[in-house]
Amino acid sequence: MIEALKKKFNDKIAIVTGRGFNAISSSLKEILNQFNVENSVFLEDESRDLAKPNPQSLIRAMKGLDSKNCLYVGDSMEDMILAQKASELGFKATFCGIYGSGKLPDMRKKLFVKYDVPLILETINQLPDILMIKKT
């Protein structure tokens, strides 16, 4: 899936996560190398004032990728607010809400619907189909 996304978005794939680099490295292992790590942001390793929903982490990643717009995939209301705030500051971030991960998926889905999230998916594995990307 990552290879297909990289092809679709000209290798401009980065991560903005609340977790730290070591935690992400441990869970993603070799997959992490598929992302532009240099322009990714690992908020656990940053100062607390950058915590979600502060949009500066996403804006920094977008600037590093030389991008004026992005698709931001997340599973929380903080992620949704972060994307909205980035857009308000001139960095168009289309939010894709993932509701099937974690606790209370039905409640999360209802909140995403209530706040007119443009893309709402049960799992990130549905993303290539929604974006009409051929999986490799």
Feature-to-residue mapping (PLM):
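Short amphipathic alpha-helical segments and helix-helix/interface helices
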Residues: 1-7, 58, 62, 109
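Alpha-helix termini
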Residues: 5-9, 32-33, 84-94, 135
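Substrate-recognition "cap/lid" segment bordering the active-site pocket of phosphatases
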Residues: 14, 18-71, 77-88
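Short, acidic/turn-prone active-site loops that include or flank metal/cofactor-
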Residues: 41-49, 98-104, 126
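Acidic, Mg2+-coordinating phosphoryl-transfer loop and its flanking beta/alpha structural elements
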Residues: 72-119
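Short acidic-hydrophobic, aromatic-tinged amphipathic segments that line or gate anion-handling sites
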Residues: 118-127
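Short amphipathic alpha-helix with an adjacent loop that forms part of the alpha/beta core around
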Residues: 127-136
